[in-house]
Amino acid sequence: MLNIFSLICLNSALHSSSFFFAKLPEAYAFFNPIVDVMPVIPVLFFLLALVWQAAVSFR
């Protein structure tokens, strides 16, 4: 079971590393600034939730 799990993790890590370094086709080159910001969006939602909870005194 552990071998299957490690194989899945290793396989996804190899695919994701090549995915991060892929370039957009020339027709979509104007989306590059948006694509660069997209990985930060979940962090912004986390910070929004933290500020919201601070505003309501962490009820």
Curated annotation (Swiss-Prot):
UniProt keywords, alphabetically: Chloroplast, Membrane, Photosynthesis, Photosystem II, Plastid, Reaction center, Thylakoid, Transmembrane, Transmembrane helix
Cellular component, GO, one term: chloroplast thylakoid membrane
Mitochondrion recorded as keyword: no
Residue ranges of the propeptide: 1-22
Topology in the lipid bilayer: Single-pass membrane protein
Alphabetized InterPro entries for the sequence: PSII_PsbK, PSII_PsbK_sf
One Pfam family it belongs to: PsbK
Gene Ontology BP terms: photosynthesis
Function, as annotated: One of the components of the core complex of photosystem II (PSII). PSII is a light-driven water:plastoquinone oxidoreductase that uses light energy to abstract electrons from H(2)O, generating O(2) and a proton gradient subsequently used for ATP formation. It consists of a core antenna complex that captures photons, and an electron transfer chain that converts photonic excitation into a charge separation.
Name of the featured protein: Photosystem II reaction center protein K
Source organism: Calycanthus floridus var. glaucus
